[in-house]
Amino acid sequence: MWSQSFLGSAPKLCLFSSSLPPFSHHKIHKFFCFAQNPSSTVSINLSKRHLNLSILTLFFNGFLLDNKAKSMEELQRYTDSNNGFTLLIPSSYTKVEKAGANALFEELNNGSNNIGVVVSPVRIKSLDQFGSPQFVADKLINAEKRKESTKEAEVVSVGERAGLGQQVYEFEYKIDSTRGGIKRVFSAAFVSSNKLYLLNVVHSDKPENPLDSSTRMSLEQVLHSFDALPLT
């Protein structure tokens, strides 16, 4: 643990010395800092044990941050040229076929965690013609509440961002269902070329096994990556 006391003016020169023989078990390192006033000195003692602990702490913190960064990088680009959309998908998810979905990806060995995209023709040219982000969020949550399996549903957040030539609405909501318990849902929607694009990212968020921050950040990246392809 570092302790420091400055006397007089700012330190000008620092020297390193050892207070005990090199092979002493409790070797103490001393850093003597001489200020501009020779009579004002600062002595900082740091035991070898504390030094080792500090190094280990830095090492493991760096290791954990590195692992977290790697987990954030485990996303791959998926592009559907026929339907005109693109997004990032976690590498642990595999594509499956299901009626009603233009694209569906499920987590390996845990199909309840999934990412789905549905594309439908509409008459409107932009999403704001349908309503505000809050209006659309209310429609989504009311649709969830009408399901027999839904015990409770609540909107967590509502947002909006600029996509490729169109506005993208983003939503986060929480559902407690008889089918799989509590789930966290991230949704995004936009209209392009008279088509409604809807993304649903569903992940388990049970009290005994809550959604961890690293996974959440990855799923948010998926949400923010959902966009239309450039018109050719």
Swiss-Prot record:
Transmembrane portions of the chain: none
A Pfam family of this chain: PsbP
Transit peptide, from-to: 1-34, 35-71
A biological process term (GO) from this entry: photosynthesis
UniProt entry keywords in alphabetical sequence: Chloroplast, Plastid, Thylakoid, Transit peptide
A cellular component term, taken from the record's GO annotations: photosystem II oxygen evolving complex
Primary localisation category: plastid
GO molecular function: calcium ion binding
Subcellular location: Plastid, Chloroplast thylakoid lumen
Stored NCBIfam families: PSII_PsbP
Protein name: PsbP domain-containing protein 2, chloroplastic
Family the UniProt entry places it in: Belongs to the PsbP family.
